A protein has these predicted regions:
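Non-catalytic C-terminal accessory region of glycerolipid acyltransferases
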Residues: 130-242
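Generic preference for hydrophobic
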Residues: 60, 74, 97, 204-206
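Short gly/ser/thr-rich secondary-structure transition/capping motifs
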Residues: 53-61, 129-130, 186-188
Length: 242
């Protein structure tokens, strides 16, 4: 039943998105900064509705570590499409996600993502990947936070996959803090029950900021391992509360 209700809501959301796209387009012509600030609250509302219909109980820990008025690189462990929903409904405005290029081909979703300055990464094209990193650095400098999963893909295993160190260039070059974000049980909603949606208790924890500009060069070299260890510890701790 939850699955049917989510599908019905998505159809409704797609319908009302049409005039909202036009509003966002016009605002973007007036001021490019207004487009993401208009779009993200509408997307957050949609995500909140999906979480509610899905029967998700969302526990947010470490709210004091969510930076308001300053951009940051939010680094999360990736287990499910619902990571994005849990992330966006708790993230500051404006925030953009780094996603694989295939998502950019989905009609309605890709339009909203582009309106929010989300980045599409082609993992098979190094030049395009570098351009994406440079775009992300400029977004961070301009005040837009970025959510990224350094594992590079969804992980269904017990242990976190190795982190791609290049992801952290976004924070290093923009001189913005890294905030590890630990997610638990997001795959309990959908991926573990395909094609059905089940209720679940999602825990998202924002960890203390890490300032790379205060680190030694040797520490920066292994920042991915450091953040991975922090997230692995938090995921293990929060698993006991699930």
């Amino acid at each position: 039943m939850r699955t049917v209700l989510v599908v019905i809501f998505l159809l409704f959301y797609a319908l009302i998105s049409l005039p909202m796209f036009l509003v966002g387009f016009i605002l973007g012509k007036i001021d490019p900064h207004k487009k993401p600030r208009f779009s993200q609250p509408f997307v957050i509302w949609g995500f909140r509705m999906i979480l509610r219909i899905s029967g998700v109980k969302l526990t947010v820990k470490g709210k004091e570590n969510i930076l308001r008025g300053q951009s940051a690189l939010y680094v999360f462990n990736h287990r499910s499409y619902f990571d994005i929903l849990a992330g966006y409904v708790t993230a500051p405005v404006p925030t953009a996600f780094v996603s694989k290029k295939e998502i950019g081909k989905l009609p309605m979703i890709s339009r909203w993502m582009k309106y929010m300055n989300c980045l599409f990464l082609d993992r098979d094209d190094m030049k395009q990947g570098m351009r994406t990193i440079l775009q992300g650095i400029e977004l961070l400098k301009d005040g837009t936070s970025i959510y990224i999963a350094p594992e590079g893909t969804r992980n269904s295993g017990e242990e976190l996959l190795p982190f791609h160190e290049a992801s952290f260039k976004l924070a290093d070059k923009s001189k913005r803090p890294v905030i590890p974000v630990a997610l638990n049980n997001t795959d309990e909603v959908f991926e573990k029950h395909l094609p059905w949606i089940h209720s679940a208790h999602i825990i998202i924890e924002y960890c203390e900021p890490i300032y790379m500009d205060q680190m030694e060069r040797a520490e920066k070299k292994h920042i991915g391992e450091t953040v991975r260890a922090i997230l692995a510890e938090k995921v293990a701790e929060n698993a006991k509360e699930s």
